[in-house]
């Protein structure tokens, strides 16, 4: 943060004096000492103090702080006139005070701590979402308030607001000073820092030279090195610094806003407080930080951007994505690593998100249906953040290194030095009765002592004036309530809420009107052409710098010059000035100087001086609040001169009284009488000077009244002049944009005519192509169908013939088998009979007969053989015929099988042809579908055409006919 964050990672056991704490400033490890001559202002600090030690507030056991969750609220903005004109509908709405529900799907709903409708004011949002965080910060508990949402959802309006409706940051600053006013038993020191994160680069908005600052980390946490911190004395002082920082912030025009935030900003208010008076000795100092974060809006990928805007959007989305990832990891108890280092935003806010700060998240959403998805993502992010548990702790600095302690010690030391200077004034001893001889010697000693005393008095007067100025300057930095310290602050908690009334001087530093809800004409004007973004950004940035509203506008350029020169003397002048707090509502804070309380120097003044102070007090009552730092400085200078003259007059009165006593004792001493006369003349001259200064003060007060009246007139004239310049600039820009739009319109008209001709040609080509394709396809399909029918008839005829031949062959084969079986049985019988006869013949013949009748037997045998062969031939002739028939039947079967094989081959070939036909038909269907796509595109671009519809109907009838085939 702007200064070091507290040590949030310390263990629970280290809650004593050994715990490390956050330091009070943040650019280096040593604090820059402030010299008396004013070359280094205590009001502006950019140095880093040494290591400090603090511990959480040891609460009683009955009041131990319990865990709590992040406060999450949702704020709806109303529909813009542009969205209403475009007919946008409400997609999300607030269902009661805690529920957000989807209009189209009521089952989708999310619950939060509070949901604010479009009519809710920012003051009500502050009371619910931010007041408890600010109140805790004033008590020593760190706090962080986020504004999260998409572009044009109202984040910057919620955080900064305008003169009619101040935002969270002005209300928080005003509330902080109101709490100081209501806490009379403590004294406070407030300082602020303001930074931005643009394209992952950290810039200091209070110091134009502070670019690309580095983020450091030590045992105490993360801090930004070199960030400038400014001590603030009043709400107007703080708001003026914020306004100066806003002029340095990166903004630009987008498709949604004329002036859209292109960077994340972190406004840090560091609060130190200690018990008032002697109670502060040895007491711990409460140290806390209040971080008010205005996040840049996430951008959808649907938004067409280029160049710088695209680069900015990518960095913004990256940091917001990292923030969402960190939130998801913090809600996941199983997550072991949280990617804080993936983005500068999460790394700076690491201490705030670690669970020891009180955090409030304000999600701004739009109910428009065109942003329904982005709104849903925002609601889911808020829902995840609601589950983060925190345990807020009070931080106390237990050493003497805090800035408020340093100022208190320096004030005490300066007062002691002032007392020593007063005591070192050696009174002139009382003259006793002396002789005439010693008169000359005493006269010479008196002259020498008078010269030395005069020079010493002059030196002491200069030293006292410097010490008084230094004491007053340091005392003004510490803010103290004007209420009675004996009054307790507790009863005010039960009273009605205090109202945040802003004076004219404070409202002067707020924007004149909210920038996120632009007029329709301006919005249409500045988003019409993409290429003019950079020119419009530069022009409106200059216009933003020159347009200032309020009574103190004429001082702002001078203030910016001082800040740009980076001189510490400007901060000194600012610190010397009386805080200009508006007198409104009774809740303003008076920063009073405690120099007059118990000061011995003030007791030495005479009654005429008291009368002059009474006159001065009356002039204070008549004085109205200063309208500028210049008036305040001049008035303070006149008062300081009068005080110095009064002190010199008091010293001369004491010297006059002493010399009067000496003159009474020695009335003959002419030198003493002359010195008394000189002192009387000096006192008279000083009284005349004091009277002149009083008249100047009164004239200055009266002049300030007249200046206020003149400033009102000048303000009205300046506002009219600004409005005239604004309208003329808008008229010029509108005329230029109109010319560009007219040129673009002419180009688009020519393009439309060319496209119409192309569409007509395409229609004609499409109709011809459709007719040709349909005719060709029909002819091909008819030819294929005819060929298939003929092939089918031939195959059926051939199949019938083959079936008949097969049945005939089967009949012949069965008959041949029967005959062959009968013949085989007869052959077997004949063979058996022949064997039996041969056996009988062998048994009947004797061996001798066989020998004698060998020849006869042989002849008989041969004859028998011949007869048997003849008989066998007679028997074999039918079998040969059967074999021949069988052989013929086998040949027929083989021919039948060959015919069947040819038939199968023909069927396979026909199936292949049929498959190719189907593939060709599918190809033609795909081509027809492509033609239909082209026809649909043409019909969407030019409307329904009767000729195309007729062709479509004919094509569909053709497809139905083909389907029947």
Swiss-Prot record:
GO terms for MF: ATP binding; microtubule binding; microtubule motor activity
Keyword set includes Lipid metabolism: no
Residues that, per the record, bind ATP: 149-156
Domain of life from the UniProt record: Eukaryota
Limits of the Kinesin motor domain: 69-388
GO terms classed as biological process: microtubule-based movement
Biased composition regions of type Basic residues, renumbered to the chain: 551-561
Main location as per UniProt: plastid
Record's keyword terms, sorted: ATP-binding, Chloroplast, Coiled coil, Microtubule, Motor protein, Nucleotide-binding, Plastid, Transit peptide
This protein's GO CC annotations: chloroplast; microtubule
Annotated Low complexity bias: 19-28, 40-56, 564-577, 851-862
Renumbered residue ranges of the record's region Disordered: 1-69, 551-633, 842-888, 942-965
Residues in coiled coil: 389-483, 628-703, 738-846, 896-931
Polar residues compositional bias, start-end: 29-38, 949-965
Compositional bias annotation for Basic and acidic residues: 606-623, 864-888
InterPro entries in UniProt: Kinesin-like_fam, Kinesin_motor_CS, Kinesin_motor_dom, Kinesin_motor_dom_sf, P-loop_NTPase
Compartments, as annotated in UniProt: Plastid, Chloroplast
One Pfam family hit: Kinesin
UniProt key word Transit peptide: yes
Recorded family membership: Belongs to the TRAFAC class myosin-kinesin ATPase superfamily. Kinesin family. KIN-7 subfamily.
Name of the protein described by the UniProt record: Kinesin-like protein KIN-7K, chloroplastic
Species: Arabidopsis thaliana
Underlying gene: KIN7K
